[in-house]
Regions:
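P-loop NTPase catalytic phosphate-binding loop
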Residues: 2-125, 135-205, 211-227, 231-232, ...
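Conserved phosphate/pyrophosphate-binding and hydrolysis machinery centered on Walker-type P-loop NTPases
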Residues: 130, 134
């Protein structure tokens, strides 16, 4: 989960998600931070940085945070996992609509997302609504560079359509990439992401490509400091954030809780 320093408050910061009871977040060292779950939960999100910059920690934090505060009735996921490493553990969640880890299944999963988006637009048209009022669907992709290098012809048109139209239908892309190159994160694709989390990059040029300014190249190596740091670009604003790493035991506990539920809340 992402946190921003809240220096003017002596109380834990809270965030209301999906109109539910506010959730209080306190870091292990007792400092108070303002959570970014509300912002992340309602936008496309791009997470990118060099290898070892904390991308997997951030993605796991986002998924775990969303699952901790909402039921499968309100939040669903399509997991696109060409790396076959980080997202596999979430396949058994009742929130998981589809899990894909090979070319055929990845194309099928993205096609499913587009079909669901179109279905929601049909409902919105029939009800004369500008935004979808039902559940949120997150299409989590780890690793974007694998798709853009191996399956671009089949997958990029689907990704671009979701990026351009998905937000109104509550179909949100969460894309992670450890390759910060223009041929992977194209300007046509990136401009549809109002929220970008820039992690440590190799060069200032890569930082500018991600968040439109320098800074990511100066972030410390999380392996050396023991904690993840990043820079979030939210529209025209940028700010530094610390990234809390959920222990593997906590992620497992959350997954086991939901898989043990006899019925969906």
């Amino acid at each position: 989960m992402f946190f921003r320093r809240n220096k003017n408050s002596s109380k834990p910061a809270t965030a209301t998600v999906n109109n539910q009871k506010p959730v209080t977040y306190i870091t292990p060292n007792g400092q108070y931070y303002k959570p970014f779950l509300t912002m992340v939960a309602n936008n496309h999100l791009l997470v990118a940085g060099a290898t070892g910059s904390g991308k997997s920690v951030a993605i796991n934090g986002i998924i775990t945070s969303l699952v901790m505060v909402d039921s499968p009735y309100n939040v669903q996921f399509i997991f696109i996992d060409p790396k076959r490493v980080e997202l596999q553990q979430y396949e058994k969640l009742p929130h998981c609509v589809y899990y894909a880890d090979n070319k055929a299944d990845i194309i099928k999963g993205l096609t499913m997302a587009v079909i669901e988006m179109e279905r929601r637009f049909a409902i919105m048209k029939a009800q004369q609504e500008k935004t979808f009022t039902g559940s949120k669907l997150y299409i989590v992709i780890d690793e974007l560079s694998d798709i853009m290098t191996s399956y671009k012809k089949e997958c990029f048109p689907l990704l671009l359509k979701l990026a351009q139209l998905g937000r109104a239908a509550k179909c949100f892309l969460v894309c992670a990439s450890q390759t910060v190159l223009a041929k992977i994160i194209t300007s046509e694709f990136r401009c549809n992401f109002p929220v970008i989390l820039g992690l440590r990059t190799a060069t200032a040029q890569q930082s500018r490509m991600l968040i439109d300014c320098n800074g990511c190249e100066q972030l410390p190596d999380p392996k050396a400091t023991g904690k993840g740091q990043g820079i979030i670009r939210d529209g025209a604003d940028t700010f530094n954030v610390d990234i809390y790493k959920y222990p593997d035991s906590e992620i497992t506990r959350v997954i086991n809780y939901w898989t043990s539920k006899a019925c969906i809340a």
